[in-house]
Amino acid sequence: MVPSIKVTKILDPIFENRCLVPFISFSENESFPDGTKPPVWFALSEDRPLAFFAGIWTPQWKSVRKVKEGETTNALFAFLTTAPNTEVGVIHPKAMPVIFTTPDEIETWLTVQTPEAMRLQRPLPDGALKIVARGERKDG
C-alpha cells in the first residue's frame, strides 16, 4: 500500500459515505524525455467490461473553487488509490485506483464498517489489467 499522511481522523466522516465509480477503462499518462505525456488506457480486457473504483462522496464540501464565485458548497466524490500493480506501475509508479471486480468486494465496500472496508484498499493482482489503447481517446 502507498504510504499516506495520517489524515484518516480528519476524513473519518467522509469514509462513511462510500460509493462506487463505474468505469470501463482508465488512463495514466506515460512520460517521455521530450516532455510529452500521452495517455495509456487500461481495462480488465479488450472487451472493456464494467468495473468500479472505490469511491467516497460528500454532499456538503465547502471550498473556493473559483475566486469570482467565492466559497461554495458542493457535492463531490473521489476515488481511492493504492500502490500500483505491475501493469500500471510501469506507466505510473506511484499509485493506481482501487478497483472492484466482484459482487463480494462491492457488497463489502458499501456495507461494512470503515476499518474493514479499508482492507480492500489494495491493487488488483498482477495480470488483471491490460493496456487496451495508447494516445488520445478516439471513441467519444
Where are these regions (language model features)?
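A structured binding-face within diverse protein domains that lines the active/interaction site
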Residues: M1-G140
